[in-house]
Amino acid sequence: MKSQSKRTSRLFVFVGVVVAIIIAVLSWRYFGTGSDNNTSGAQQSARGQDTSHGGRRNTPLAPVQAATATEQEVPRYLTGLGTVIAANTVTVTSRVDGELMALHFTEGQQVKAGDLLAEIDPRPYEVQLTQAQGQLAKDQATLDNARRDLARYQKLSKTGLISQQELDTQSSLVRQSEGSVKADQGAIDSAKLQLTYSRITAPISGRVGLKQVDVGNYITSGTATPIVVITQTHPVDVVFTLPESDIPAIMQAQKNAEKTHAIVPVEAWDRTNKQMLAQGYLLSIDNQIDTTTGTIKLKARFNNEDDVLFPNQFVNARIKVDLLQNAVVVPTAAVQMGSEGNFVWTLDDANRVSKHLVTTGIQDSQQVVIDAGLNAGQRVVTDGIDRLTEGVQVEVVTPRSANTDTNPASAEKAAAEAEGSTPHQGRGRPANAPARSTTAAEKS
C-alpha cells in the first residue's frame, strides 16, 4: 500500500514539473517577443520620424546620362547586297596552232593593252611567208611578161599582122596574171598575220590571273583551255539589288542628278558593314524586275585605284538618294520600344523625366532621326533608362573616362557615391541586406 502511494506521488511531481516547464516556455515566448516587437516598433517609429524630417534629402537620385536633340542634314541611303565584277574580262587564247615557246607575264601582275604575254613557235609561219613571197615574185614576173606581149600585140593589131582573137587572148592572159599576183599578195598578208598571231599580246589593260598552260605544250586555236584570263579592275563595277519599292526613290535621285549634271553617289562597304571600302557612282539600272525575288539590279562604278575591290568580292552597296534638311537627331540609345511604340525619356530644367512617344525615321548604329514627337534642343536620356518612372527626378552625370574605369579604387569610390555612400558588401552589412539612409538620430 505504501509502495503504491509513493508511485502516485512521484507521478504527480513529474506532471507538475512538465506543466511548469510548458508554462515557462509559453510565458517567455509571449512576453519576450512582445518586448522585442515593442522595441523594434519604437526604433522604426523613431527612424520614421527622422526620415520625415531629413531622410528624403539623403536618398540618392538615380544617375543617368543625357544628350540634346539637334538639327542636322542627314543623307538617306538605300543598302543592298552586291558583288564586285570586272569592268571587262578577257579569256586569252591562241589564234594559231603551235608550241608555246615563252610566257612573258607574272601571275597576278597588272598589264597594259599591247603588252606581250606569250609566244607561239613562229617558224612554220615564217616558212609560209617566204613561200608566199616567192610565189608572188614568180607570178609578178609572168604578169610583167604578159603585159609586154600585150603591148606588142596591140601595135601589130593596128597594122593587121595579128588577128583580134590573138589580141583578146593576150589581154586575158594579162588579167589572169594580175589575179595570180593579187592572190599571192593575199597569201603574203595571211602569212604575216599568222606570224603576228604567234606573238600573243594583252587585248585590254588589267590584272592577269593564274596561268592555265605551261611552256612547251602544243596549243591549237579554238581550244577551250585559255592561256590566262585578264580582268580589268581600273575601274571596277559592283552589281547589287534593291527591292522594287525603292525604284521611285532611285529614279528621282537620277533625275535630280541629271538636272545639276551631278552623279548619284554609291559607297561600297565590307561584308560586316563596318568599314567603307570605296566611293563611286551609279552607272546604270536594269530594265526589268526579277519576278522571283521582287528586286531590281543596279550597277555602280568605282575607280578602285587602291585595288581594295576584287572581282567576285561580296560587298554592301549604299546608294545616296536624298538629303534630309533640318532633321531632328538623337543617339540611337535614347529610343526605346514599348507596347505603345517607340518612345524617349525627356528631361526638364529640374531634371525630371517624362515619357514621349516618337516616330522614328532614318537610323544607324549611332543616331536616329525623329520624324515626330520631339523638338531640337530637348534633352533625352541615353543611359540609366531601366530605373526611370514618370516624373521622377534624376541626376545627370557625364560618362567616366577610360582611365577612371580602369582604376579599381576610383570605380569603387564612384559606385559608393552613386549609391549614397552605402557601405561596401562585407564591410558593415551582409551582401543581401538592403541599404538604408543614415538618419539624424543615428548620427547623434
UniProtKB/Swiss-Prot annotation:
Subcellular location: Cell inner membrane
Keywords: Cell inner membrane, Cell membrane, Membrane, Repeat, Signal, Transport
Family to which this protein belongs: Belongs to the membrane fusion protein (MFP) (TC 8.A.1) family.
Membrane topology listed for this record: Peripheral membrane protein
One Pfam family named in its UniProt record: HlyD_D23
Assembly behavior: Part of a tripartite efflux system composed of MdtA, MdtB and MdtC.
NCBIfam families assigned to the protein according to its UniProt record, in alphabetical order: PRK11556.1, RND_mfp
Compositionally biased region (Polar residues): 37-52, 435-444
Protein name: Multidrug resistance protein MdtA
Keyword Ribosomal protein appears in the UniProt entry: no
Keyword Oxidoreductase appears in the UniProt entry: no
Protein's organism: Yersinia pseudotuberculosis serotype IB (strain PB1/+)
Annotated region (Disordered), positions in chain: 37-60, 399-444
N-terminal signal peptide: 1-20
UniProt biased composition (Low complexity): 409-419
